[in-house]
C-alpha cells in the first residue's frame, strides 16, 4: 500500500492540468482582413480589398465571460493577420465594420474556429467587413 501512495498526488496533479484555450501553445490562427465599401442602398462601391492597420480581435474559449476581446493585432499590408502561440481550443476571431442598420453604426464580423491539436495552423481565409464611404 505504501508503495502506491506516491501515485495519488501525481494522479491528482495530472488530472487538474486541463488547460483552457489561450496563449501558451504552438498552434496558430491566421487569415486576411478585407473591406468593401457599401452605399446606403447596399450596393458595393469598391472592393473587397486588403485592409491595412485595422484591429482584428480574438476571444479565447467559448466567450462565456461576455465575449470581451482577449487580444488583438493590426492587419498587415496585404490585410494578413495571425495569432501565434495558442493552445488547443476554441477561438472567435472578429473585426468591427460599419453598418447602416445597427443603432451604433458598427457591427462585428466574426468566425469561430477550433485548433484541434497543439501544433495546428488554422487559416480562416478572408474576413470581410463593410466600410461606409
Question: Model-flagged regions — what are they?
Answer:
Residues 89-93:
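A short tyrosine-centered beta-strand micro-motif
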Residues 47-72:
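Short amphipathic beta-strand segments in non-cytosolic proteins
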Residues 13-16:
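C-terminal motif of bacterial Sec signal peptides marking the signal peptidase cleavage site
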Amino acid at each position: 500500500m505504501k508503495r502506491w501512495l506516491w501515485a495519488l498526488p501525481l494522479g491528482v496533479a495530472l488530472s487538474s492540468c486541463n488547460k483552457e484555450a489561450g496563449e501558451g501553445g504552438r498552434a496558430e490562427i491566421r487569415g486576411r482582413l478585407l473591406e468593401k465599401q457599401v452605399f446606403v442602398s447596399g450596393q458595393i462601391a469598391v472592393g473587397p480589398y486588403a485592409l491595412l492597420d485595422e484591429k482584428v480581435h480574438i476571444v479565447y474559449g467559448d466567450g462565456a465571460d461576455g465575449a470581451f476581446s482577449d487580444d488583438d493585432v493590426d492587419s498587415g499590408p496585404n490585410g494578413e493577420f495571425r495569432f501565434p502561440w495558442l493552445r488547443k481550443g476554441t477561438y472567435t476571431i472578429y473585426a468591427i465594420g460599419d453598418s447602416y442598420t445597427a443603432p451604433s453604426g458598427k457591427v462585428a464580423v466574426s468566425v469561430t474556429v477550433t485548433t484541434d491539436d497543439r501544433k495546428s495552423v488554422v487559416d480562416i481565409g478572408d474576413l470581410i467587413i463593410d466600410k461606409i464611404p
